[in-house]
Amino acid sequence: MTPWLGLVVLLSCWSLGHWGAEACTCSPSHPQDAFCNSDIVIRAKVVGKKLVKEGPFGTLVYTIKQMKMYRGFSKMPHVQYIHTEASESLCGLKLEVNKYQYLLTGRVYEGKMYTGLCNFVERWDHLTLSQRKGLNYRYHLGCNCKIKSCYYLPCFVTSKNECLWTDMLSNFGYPGYQSKHYACIRQKGGYCSWYRGWAPPDKSISNATDP
């Protein structure tokens, strides 16, 4: 079993079954939570890949060209390789080589960066302007706040450091408007609330503030 399998639990990613009956299941995560809970957050382009171990628990190693680091300077100032399970049923991540720039998040284990399907990984050109601004500084400002998931009504915040995340209630599903356009940031008086960046006003989201 590779070191990544031990990290799967920490990343809220479960492997169900065994061999032929495996599945990867991930809990929804707001990009800000993904940012704050990751050891490493970078923008990079994949320039190569190699399978370093054969068999059902093979490991894919991607060679990357790091464009920018948003989080993790003290743990790993420069990332050249990222590791993931070879099988998608074990939460392994499939990335295109020499095609796109990606936003990559992950954990550091024994000096190596590991990532997978349960991490926040997205093509850079698919990120909204608000998400890009969040990566630069807004998400970091909100790491002391707590984003509380709401899967069904009624649901409420229970402390002043919480923002209620209601994307899962939307007919459009996840990722929704709050994921794409909002950060949960501590405001005056010590209360955390949703902060809207580049997106137009949305009256359906309560306790949101303009920049």
From Swiss-Prot:
Pfam families: TIMP (PF00965). Induction: Highly induced by phorbol ester (PMA), EGF and transforming growth factor-beta 1. Also induced by dexamethasone. Disruption phenotype: Timp3 deficiency results in a failure of liver regeneration via sustained activation of TNF leading to hepatocyte apoptosis. In addition, Timp3-deficient mice show abnormalities in the choroidal vasculature. Transmembrane segments: none annotated. The record marks N37 as: Involved in metalloproteinase-binding. Residues 105-188 are annotated as: Mediates interaction with EFEMP1. Keywords: Disulfide bond, Extracellular matrix, Metal-binding, Metalloenzyme inhibitor, Metalloprotease inhibitor, Protease inhibitor, Secreted, Signal, Zinc. Residues 24-27, 88-89 are annotated as: Involved in metalloproteinase-binding. One of its GO terms (molecular function) is zinc ion binding. SMART domains: NTR (SM00206). GO terms for cellular component: basement membrane; extracellular space. CDD domains: NTR_TIMP (cd03585). Disulfide bonds join C24-C91, C26-C118, C36-C143, C145-C192, C150-C155, C163-C184. Zn(2+) binds at C24. One of its GO terms (biological process) is negative regulation of extracellular matrix disassembly. Highest levels are found in kidney, lung and brain followed by ovary and uterus. Low levels are found in bone. Residues 24-143 form the NTR domain. Residues 1-23 form the signal peptide. InterPro entries: Netrin_domain, TIMP, TIMP-like_OB-fold, TIMP_C, TIMP_CS. Its main location: secreted. It is found in: Secreted, Extracellular space, Extracellular matrix. Mediates a variety of processes including matrix regulation and turnover, inflammation, and angiogenesis, through reversible inhibition of zinc protease superfamily enzymes, primarily matrix metalloproteinases (MMPs). Regulates extracellular matrix (ECM) remodeling through inhibition of matrix metalloproteinases (MMP) including MMP-1, MMP-2, MMP-3, MMP-7, MMP-9, MMP-13, MMP-14 and MMP-15. Additionally, modulates the processing of amyloid precursor protein (APP) and apolipoprotein E receptor ApoER2 by inhibiting two alpha-secretases ADAM10 and ADAM17. Belongs to the protease inhibitor I35 (TIMP) family. Interacts with EFEMP1. Interacts with KDR. This is Metalloproteinase inhibitor 3. It comes from Mus musculus. The lineage of its organism: Eukaryota, Metazoa, Chordata, Craniata, Vertebrata.
